């Protein structure tokens, strides 16, 4: 995709696979046990919501369907947590917070970024699990104020938030696997650099060879 978009070279996907077989590069396949999952479920400790999306993650444009979750990274310095706001239509990570603690301050930082990024008139549905953060009145009230509809996965059904879980899988394969950090701030800088790469550089087949930012900008121009 990069050859086509940047250099104008047209090469079939099957040709690329053939060359990879001949030259030796392989794509690593992750195992479920490779990464640690963060579980924020504490029961019904606040306001809960219906599963509005019902695993229908398809979106015909940006700012229609989104997801959020918290994922954990274990490094030599300790643990770090990422809380993103992920657009299912553009595949863009539109806001995020990287923290040593998965607390409400992290969620406030992510929501501040979401508020700055949202275009006027956007009213997306956001999928999430039943974690305690997402039941907290500070979180639910902030989303209402932004015009975002909450959609909650059923207890024990990670497939209800499969789109965001898929993002975490790609991220941990491409950014985290086989690496380690001794310093949180260095880890944070590197993860933010990867998020920039994901949004602005990494082209995706589902976006017809565009980057998430290119897709979003093209879609919004077409809707104007």
Model-identified regions with their sequence ranges:
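An active-site-proximal beta-strand-loop segment
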Residues: 55-94, 100-104
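Short small-residue beta-strand/loop micro-motif enriched in glycine and branched aliphatics
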Residues: 90-96, 150-153, 177-178
């Amino acid at each position: 995709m990069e050859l086509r978009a940047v250099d104008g070279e047209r090469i079939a996907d099957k040709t690329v696979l053939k060359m990879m077989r001949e030259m030796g590069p392989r794509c690593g396949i992750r195992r479920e046990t490779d990464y640690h999952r963060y579980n924020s479920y504490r029961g019904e400790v606040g306001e809960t919501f219906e599963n509005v999306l019902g695993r229908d993650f398809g979106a015909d444009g940006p700012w229609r369907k989104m997801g959020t979750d918290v994922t954990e990274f274990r490094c030599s310095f300790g643990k770090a947590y990422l809380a993103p706001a992920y657009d299912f239509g553009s595949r863009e990570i539109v806001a995020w917070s990287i923290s040593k603690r998965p607390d409400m301050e992290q969620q406030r930082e992510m929501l501040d970024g979401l508020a700055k990024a949202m275009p006027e008139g956007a009213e997306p549905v956001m999928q999430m699990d039943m974690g305690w953060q997402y039941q907290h009145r500070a979180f639910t009230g902030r989303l209402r104020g932004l015009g975002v509809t909450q959609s909650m996965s059923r207890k024990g059904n990670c497939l209800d938030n499969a789109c965001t879980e898929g993002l975490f899988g790609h991220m941990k394969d491409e950014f985290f696997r086989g690496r380690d950090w001794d310093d949180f701030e260095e880890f944070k800088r590197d993860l933010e650099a990867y998020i920039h790469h994901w949004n602005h550089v990494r082209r995706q087949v589902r976006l017809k060879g565009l980057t998430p930012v290119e897709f979003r900008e093209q879609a919004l121009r077409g809707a104007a």
